[in-house]
Amino acid sequence: MKRTIAIVAGGDTSEFHVSLRSAQGIYSFIDKEKYTLYIVEMQGTRWEVQLPDGAKAPVDRNDFSFMLGTEKIRFDFAYITIHGTPGEDGRLQGYFDMMHIPYSCCGVLAAAITYDKFTCNQYLKAFGVRIAESLLLRQGQSVSDEDVMEKIGLPCFIKPSLGGSSFGVTKVKTKEQIQPAIVKAFEEAQEVLVEAFMEGTELTCGCYKTKDKTVIFPPTEVVTHNEFFDYDAKYNGQVDEITPARISDELTNRVQMLTSAIYDILGCSGIIRVDYIVTAGEKINLLEVNTTPGMTTTSFIPQQVRAAGLDIKDVMTDIIENKF
């Protein structure tokens, strides 16, 4: 019998529509001869299954099921592709743990740690991972322009400590831009990160592990035509994504080994993607860890799967079957 898979998308942040695009990608990638697929759209308390006829059916949150005519359909597995709350921060993982429904990505602790960029980077710093100098501001806290310039320097990035897709991110070059950038970041999250700018080559590397194998993809080099890799660059083509990256075999291996180590340190599961900046002297600096990376047909992970000579359908099967 086919397993019934929920591709869980949507969420409660600005990344709602990005998540739905990832869900369509995943729907196209998963082997439909092995699995019955439904996209489950979540937004606040609205949990709905997209039905083949275009209608939507409410999800019973008591057991994560829905009615298809007179038949009650239960899900065997959840592929979480929500970018942001509640699917990337551990909340939904806790729900599925209580429902005893296996899912595609990291558990509660790893998801919660990685969703908060400051917490994740400070945690990994304790294991010897290089990170940028940074300051954290919580709601209600303030920092003077002088402190930012003295402790972090300019240019710097001011961004939400939570979330992704570069919503609320500003590259700050002048003193006058500091406070408006903080206000903008607080519109997206309750914690704001002030982070030193690092000059170098931006790389991103995906990885997944199952009970019997480790797969580390070829890194991608990110060359943006914008000021930085912002939403416009990510989703409107203002970037060159070069896979595999134009770096030496030795540096490629170091990036891949660091990605694998970060996966293990955090106790990850499923596919992750780690973003880096390589600065002078080939120093590898962590930018952030993504535990529910974008999965549109043009996203980094599908690119890296192709560059590795793998079939994305087989990768999806690995992720699902590893939980049974």
Curated annotation (Swiss-Prot):
Pathway: Cell wall biogenesis; peptidoglycan biosynthesis. It is an enzyme of class 6 (ligase). Disulfide bonds: none annotated. Gene3D superfamilies: 3.40.50.20, ATP-grasp fold, A domain, ATP-grasp fold, B domain. Mg(2+) 2 binds at residues 288, 290. Its cofactor is Mg(2+); Mn(2+). The keyword Zinc does not apply. Mg(2+) 1 binds at residues 275, 288. Residues 121-321 form the ATP-grasp domain. Its EC number is 6.3.2.4. One of its GO terms (molecular function) is D-alanine-D-alanine ligase activity. The keyword RNA-binding does not apply. It catalyses: 2 D-alanine + ATP = D-alanyl-D-alanine + ADP + phosphate + H(+). ATP binds at residues 149-204. It is found in: Cytoplasm. Binds 2 magnesium or manganese ions per subunit. SUPFAM superfamilies: Glutathione synthetase ATP-binding domain-like, PreATP-grasp domain. Belongs to the D-alanine--D-alanine ligase family. Cell wall formation. This is D-alanine--D-alanine ligase. The gene is ddl.
